[in-house]
Amino acid sequence: MEEIQRYLQPDRSQQHNFLYPLIFQEYIYALAHDHGLNRNRSVLLENPGYNNKFSLLIVKRLITRMYQQNNFLISTNDSNKNEFLGCNKSLYSQMISEGFAFIVEIPFSLRLISSLSSFEGKKIFKSHNLRSIHSTFPFLEDNFSHLNYVLDILIPYPVHLEILVQTLRYWVKDASSLHLLRFFLHEFWNLNSLITSKKPGYSFSKKNQRFFFFLYNSYVYECESTFVFLRNQSSRLRSTSFGALLERINFYGKMERLVEVFTKDLQVTLWLFKDPFMHYVRYQEKSILASKGTFLLMNKWKFYLVNFWQCHFSLCFHTGRIHINQLSNHSRDFMGYLSSVRLNPSMLRSQMLENSFLINNAIKKFDTLVPIIPLIGSLAKANFCTVLGHPISKPVWSDLSDSDIIDRFGRICRNLFHYYSGSSKKKTLYRIKYILRLSCARTLARKHKSTVRTFLKRSGSELLEEFLTSEEQVLSLTFPRASSSLWGVYRSRIWYLDIFCINDLANYQ
């Protein structure tokens, strides 16, 4: 971010915040490329992208062609091969989109830095812990056990392409940049299959992820504007959690003491939002709006959101995408966990003088479980086991060395144990560990043209020792003096603040 400010500071007064000239600067593509290298990779290491094709020479030739306004670059014909340098035309479009996405993020980033600087007295607030996905679950543990009903919401779809452009008009004042954005949406990609998908979960192609993530995040930010409005109207303290955090894939907000809200034109009181306990959480396209209120209040919230999104985005939003559920009677799939609020019955004996009474006291507890069936389905899709959970070999990795095979299987197991460390029951994780361990052994036996039993007898268990005890080694390093209580710590729920994305196997959708 300091590099961006250094490049932009001399030109801000002259360009009047115009972003379009930056697309002709070479350093923009270099910064976008370096930023892409720093993103978290898949554990399967199968997403090389275009980083190996990046070259400043190609960037210079690309900028020269844009200056010359060569129509061949933007022509839509059957040939996908560019005669200039023999490069694919999709590579040029991808590089332009990466640079453009990096440019249009600048107003959001500068606005975020200025708001955080003023909030902390010119000292930028570091919110790395809030970026972690696991930071959401302690919030759910502390608050959801006291609530009654929840709205399970799916972000509305589809949205017209022009709506996305109009949404960015409030942030990007440069008309040329908006025209270029409109050109990208209509000419280069079929956006209807990427952002306006009718599938339960949104999926992005491996190409141009930065560009589409930016569009999707800006669209979701606009969808949540109603919560931001109510939060700012009802509280004297300005909330920083609702800033345009471009690098975050999730955020949570808490709305307290939502009192009477008056509209500017009609001066009508919105009594349905008078709820002292309202909590909102979102990850990707799924949102949760929980309340301590009654079913009638949640039903009002539901129809308000449906009408608001239909009028604001000019789309047909079905009420079936919002479900009202009671927390104590329903388990929800959220962020790779099956979350629920269950009642723990407990008997208390109370004695008064010579009389004693038995009191049945039920305590609500927030519970998180590992969804075993979808997780086994993900392992089967990745060819680690069958759909019934029987381990099989992975022949694609048979050409690797023994250490690389063990390292890949061990890394997948460690990542899954790391992400699902907050599970209330670890028995499911040990079943996943058994599948990966036996799949690793069968892959090694296939490589050496032997059976699993013969291979283990000949090689011993040294090759799998690190794979078998990886999580115990992590805990032993964290708690070196804890010997008897080590397993007690491991069986308890642990939330980590260094998880910024869901693993491909954890995100089974």
From Swiss-Prot:
UniProt keyword Translocase, yes or no: no
Keyword tags: Chloroplast, mRNA processing, Plastid, RNA-binding, tRNA processing
Disulfide bond residue pairs: none
Any one GO cellular component localisation term in the record: chloroplast
An example Gene Ontology biological process: mRNA processing
Listed InterPro entries: Domain_X, Maturase_MatK, Maturase_MatK_N
Localization annotation: Plastid, Chloroplast
Subcellular location, principal: plastid
GO MF annotations, alphabetized: RNA binding
Record-stated family: Belongs to the intron maturase 2 family. MatK subfamily.
Function: Usually encoded in the trnK tRNA gene intron. Probably assists in splicing its own and other chloroplast group II introns.
Protein name: Maturase K
Lineage: Eukaryota, Viridiplantae, Streptophyta, Embryophyta, Tracheophyta
Gene label: matK
